[in-house]
From Swiss-Prot:
InterPro entries: Transcr_Regulatory_Elem, Transcription_factor_dom_fun, Zn2-C6_fun-type_DNA-bd_sf, Zn2Cys6_DnaBD. SUPFAM superfamilies: Zn2/Cys6 DNA-binding domain. Residues 18-47 bind DNA. GO terms for biological process: DNA-templated transcription; negative regulation of transcription by RNA polymerase II; regulation of nitrogen utilization. One of its GO terms (molecular function) is RNA polymerase II cis-regulatory region sequence-specific DNA binding. Pfam families: Fungal_trans, Zn_clus. One of its GO terms (cellular component) is nucleus. This is Uncharacterized transcriptional regulatory protein C1683.13c. It comes from Schizosaccharomyces pombe (strain 972 / ATCC 24843) (Fission yeast).
Length: 618
């Protein structure tokens, strides 16, 4: 066989593995194409497409060993009890396995394709609004609008619009200057977009530039700008945050809920996150709960491919999927923070995972307008960019599916054997998740490469979930039995990893990119460190003091964006003071953390007191 001549070595790609022929013959390969061995023998040089198999992490192997050990103990226990008790134990375990299979079987049922008749279409400012009715609805299917009656919205041709034209959007008592709006949008999409990816950035900006569209509304604009104002270094802009949020809240409640659409749901989610981050937990829980209810009302829990709406574009369908998974993710994270049951369940949905949306060339002109004002928006011109951002979103969704299992299976009353099986099973799933994430999202304590902020945040969230799943029920380390001490060591390892991630994060990034859920991550690690202090080992005590200092400093910086973090920091200090075991240690001057708030000020903040309590059972 005649081989192609080799190109210049400098211009050739170097593969990560040897070619197939060299590997089979166990000879040295220069990993070029073709390699010098194949050229020498005049043979075809072939590189397999499959990536290198990574060795299973130690933690994943240990999790599997825990599961095997549990089932061995379960079988031995079965052998020692009577037949009646055996039947009950087997039935409990069997019910758990069956429920898991039903809950997480993602294969859509054939009946899903017939759900079209349970939708009706409502006109909404020339845009489509879907309203879903289930099989038990009181509205006759014959009265529902058919798909042939749905108007098709076609986007107008892009045209250059002067800045002054945009001011017509704000004919309200409060006037938002275009330059201010532009700067706040730039801050939001550059610093916080990875925490709000249920808002499809590219098409929101396009419709904003056009003055209207299905992915833009004034209440969503003001809600987004209120987040941008929270992270602004300019005090004048920061003071605008409450005003903008109040306007968005009034508009969405007075007008948006009359005929809600995608932007109504997105606005409620943005406002919900903002209110929780400010410490107004009831208001945040209310707004997010309204958004989760809208998911069912708008039929977002059903995959658009199972409808018969041929006029819906791929982008329309993908935005609906992204909105659903955004709601699903926030539902789990908020429920995790509050210790409450989730509102959205996988068994009620057949929505496929979202994907990376294509960048459209027509967006260049709107993006250029933002770039003329500031370089803050320059990163956006790459479209929905950097595959790592989308991969971060997709893998966070998969992690939240495991969190959902933890919330529904672990934190509720069950028999001890089934509860232990659930914990072991979920712990194994978490280890499998961390082992299977893409290479660009991988991180470990020995990583030398530069790591993005989203990767660090994803690993912080993962380790906080490990802590919550395995943390002991008693805060006194000396009262833990051998099994609880083993699981506590898992928590201690994750807490140390979170501290290390924090140190790496703040060396390069600032608090502007931190999500609201960071407060829960930090306090979860702090709780384990406080338990470790009860072990009364001097060497560990010094390390714990340093770790608590790092966490409280991080929360104090985060409080510039999310005020709730300052309450969390004060609560950690209060809990630390209660850990002191001698009058000398109770002396404020001897505390290594150099702040001493009064007890009236830090008695316990209501919004996060569950973090320092045993696992919530509901």
């Amino acid at each position: 066989m005649q081989m192609k001549p080799r190109q210049d070595k400098k211009n050739q790609e170097i593969f990560r593995i040897s070619c197939q022929r060299c590997r089979q013959r166990k000879i040295k390969c220069d990993r070029l194409h073709p390699c010098f061995q194949c050229v020498k023998s005049n043979s075809q040089c072939f590189y397999p497409e499959d990536p290198i198999r990574r060795r299973a992490p130690k933690e994943y192997v240990e999790a599997l060993e825990r599961q095997i050990a549990f089932f061995e103990a379960f079988v031995k226990k079965l052998a020692k009890v009577g037949s009646d008790e055996q039947s009950l134990m087997i039935q409990d375990m069997n019910n758990k396995i069956v429920n898991e299979g039903n809950e997480y079987d993602q294969t859509p049922d054939i009946s899903a394709r017939k759900r079209r008749k349970h939708f009706r279409m409502l006109p909404q400012n020339n845009f489509r609004y879907f309203q879903f009715y289930g099989t038990t609805n009181v509205i006759s299917a014959s009265n529902l609008t058919t798909t042939s009656e749905i108007p098709t919205f076609k986007f107008p041709i892009f045209s250059k619009r002067k800045y002054n034209d945009t001011e017509n959007l704000y004919e309200q008592p409060f006037h938002l200057e275009f330059d201010t709006c532009q700067e706040l949008l730039s801050l939001f999409f550059l610093k916080q977009y990875h925490n709000f990816m249920f808002v499809f950035r590219d098409y929101f900006i396009r419709d904003f530039e056009l003055g209207g569209g299905p992915y833009y509304s004034q209440w969503l604009l003001f809600a987004i700008c209120s987040i941008g104002a929270m992270i602004s270094p300019d005090d004048d802009l920061k003071n605008l945050s409450n005003t903008l949020a109040n306007i968005a809240e009034k508009w969405v409640l007075d007008e948006g809920l009359n005929s809600p659409d995608i932007t109504t749901l997105q606005t409620l989610l943005v406002l919900g996150i903002r209110e929780i981050g400010r410490g107004l937990t009831f208001k945040g829980w209310l707004f997010s709960g309204m958004a989760f209810r809208l998911v069912y009302d708008m039929g977002l829990h059903l995959d658009p491919d199972h409808w018969d709406h041929s006029e819906e574009s791929r982008i329309d369908r993908e935005v609906r999927r992204r909105c659903f998974w955004g709601c699903f993710t926030l539902d789990k994270l908020i429920s995790l923070c509050y210790g409450r049951p989730p509102g959205l369940y996988l068994k009620q949905t057949d929505v496929r995972n979202t994907t990376q949306l294509p960048y459209i060339s027509e967006l260049d002109e709107p993006f250029e307008i933002f770039n003329k004002k500031s370089e803050l928006f320059a990163a956006v011109s790459a479209g929905e960019d950097r595959r790592g951002l989308v991969q971060f979103w997709l893998n966070q969704v998969e992690l939240c599916k495991i969190i959902h299992r933890m919330l529904t299976e672990v934190f509720e009353d069950r028999t001890s054997s089934v509860l232990e099986a659930s914990i072991n099973n979920i712990h194994t799933e978490l280890q499998k998740w961390i082992a299977d994430i893409p290479m660009e999202l991988q991180w470990n304590t020995r990583s030398q490469k530069e790591t993005s902020s989203t990767v660090l945040l994803l690993h912080m969230l993962y380790h906080s979930v490990i802590i919550i799943l395995n943390r002991p029920s008693d805060d006194n380390y000396l009262k833990l039995d051998n099994t609880e001490r083993y699981t506590f060591e898992i928590c201690w390892k994750s807490a140390k990893t979170i501290v290390q991630l924090l140190k790496i994060y703040f060396k390069k990034y600032d608090a502007d990119c931190l999500p609201m859920t960071f407060i829960h991550i930090a306090t979860s690690a702090a709780r384990i460190i406080l338990v470790k202090l009860n072990e009364n080992i001097p060497e560990d005590g010094d390390v714990c003091n340093i770790y608590l200092e790092i966490i409280t400093n991080a929360l104090d910086v985060c409080a510039n964006v999310w005020p709730l973090a300052s309450q969390a920091s004060r609560a950690i200090l209060n809990a630390y003071k209660s850990c002191a075991t001698s009058p000398k240690e109770n002396n404020e001057d001897s505390l290594p953390l150099q702040r001493s708030p009064s007890l009236d000020d830090v008695s316990r903040f209501d919004s996060l007191d569950y973090i320092f309590s045993p696992n919530v059972k509901y």
